[in-house]
Amino acid sequence: MRIGMRLLLGYFLLVAVAAWFVLAIFVKEVKPGVRRATEGTLIDTATLLAELARPDLLSGDPTHGQLAQAFNQLQHRPFRANIGGINKVRNEYHVYMTDAQGKVLFDSANKAVGQDYSRWNDVWLTLRGQYGARSTLQNPADPESSVMYVAAPIMDGSRLIGVLSVGKPNAAMAPVIKRSERRILWASAILLGIALVIGAGMVWWINRSIARLTRYADSVTDNKPVPLPDLGSSELRKLAQALESMRVKLEGKNYIEQYVYALTHELKSPLAAIRGAAEILREGPPPEVVARFTDNILTQNARMQALVETLLRQARLENRQEVVLTAVDVAALFRRVSEARTVQLAEKKITLHVTPTEVNVAAEPALLEQALGNLLDNAIDFTPESGCITLSAEVDQEHVTLKVLDTGSGIPDYALSRIFERFYSLPRANGQKSSGLGLAFVSEVARLFNGEVTLRNVQEGGVLASLRLHRHFT
């Protein structure tokens, strides 16, 4: 396959991947966007009907009031509307009214009268002066059977006397959503075609310039008198001019051939690199392979970025000679670090036991939270699935010792003396390699706080990490 075709294929794949990501975001936003717009309409409708329903509710017999009569007539009234190509042939609103205790007094579907709806989110929140809404599955086995309800209070002056809730099936919005998704897909296909045409033109221009430069380089290698080609690109033109200048300066010397060969070789090396990169994409891998390759790139990029940020943070920390100590609530600290790692704990089904401790410790809050978080991260990494981690604090008259106990395999004897060294890390069960800076950061924080950090194996299995700090300012 020619290099021009490889470049075109590589460009097209890059554009296709980018378009796929953008398209996925657009399509993903269609459904919630339509539902948010519908929710706005529902709250307007509910507010209007709540005003109309007030006399019926005050009369004491809303099932025979004007609102009930209107809905009864509506059910027998045929209508048809064409909304942008979508035919609407029936009313899809479901309306019910409750009293101030949440008991249903009127139901347009005649199914829930007399039932207690005070626990439904729309009624419960509205009765408490808040915005009430909910989305409920009519059929638990059918995820498309959900109905969106929005409620409004029925007021008699400043007194709340009931709630009116308006519901609409989400399935009624499906035609609009599907049509929008189809239009986005068509527009994306057209955009992709335009990008392909533009890419073909760009690749043709680049390929022509590279071919001219290659012919010129070959001629210079053979010591043939050839004019400097017009390459269009300023970078390639400067490169050709440099090559021409070198050829002129070395002309007539015995080693001209050696220099030109070396220069030509250096010129062909980046071309070979471009060719090699294009060959990786020439087979046109399926989207899932492209996605996996992209995910790998993003993962490695994130890892490098995290390493750089950790290095910078470590360097800043090591350059600090003093810190501003404040009273840190240990219970709140435990809560923050544990909540921040809920996902990691859930992924490995690890049980985290947090021992309540009402005590303060003298530290800089951000640094202490990062240090304790590093100890907890380390425990999560080395604790097997369905294991257990205990977060506790031991208090004496002068010190508070924060402890993280896991049920992992422990630290090998050969690593105990090096565990706090920078860039030293042990292999994880998942095969991932850490930066080796987490425990070094904890050690440096302990130094700044005039404290002490230790890690030791426990007899029952696992590792106990202890961060000993002062209770009071020193």
UniProtKB/Swiss-Prot annotation:
Keyword Transmembrane helix: yes
Swiss-Prot/TrEMBL catalytic activity: ATP + protein L-histidine = ADP + protein N-phospho-L-histidine
Modifications made to the protein after synthesis: Autophosphorylated.
A single GO cellular-component term on record: plasma membrane
Periplasmic membrane side: 1-6, 168-183
Membrane topology summary: Multi-pass membrane protein
EC number(s) reported in the record: 2.7.13.3
Main location: membrane
One Pfam family in the UniProt entry: HATPase_c
The keyword Iron-sulfur is assigned to this record: no
Domain HAMP: 205-255
Positions on the Cytoplasmic side per record topology: 28-146, 205-474
One GO process term, biological-process aspect: glycolytic fermentation
Positions of modified residues (Phosphohistidine): H265
The Histidine kinase domain, residue ranges: 262-473
Keywords: ATP-binding, Cell inner membrane, Cell membrane, Kinase, Membrane, Nucleotide-binding, Phosphoprotein, Transferase, Transmembrane, Transmembrane helix, Two-component regulatory system
Transmembrane spans: 7-27, 147-167, 184-204
Gene Ontology MF terms in the entry: ATP binding; phosphorelay sensor kinase activity
Location(s), subcellular: Cell inner membrane
PANTHER family per UniProt: HISTIDINE KINASE, SENSOR HISTIDINE KINASE YKOH
Cited NCBIfam families: PRK11100.1
Role noted for this protein: Member of the two-component regulatory system CreC/CreB involved in catabolic regulation. CreC may function as a membrane-associated protein kinase that phosphorylates CreB in response to environmental signals. CreC can also phosphorylate PhoB.
Protein's name according to its UniProt entry: Sensor protein CreC
The organism's taxonomic lineage, starting at the top: Bacteria, Pseudomonadati, Pseudomonadota, Gammaproteobacteria, Enterobacterales
Gene giving rise to this polypeptide: creC
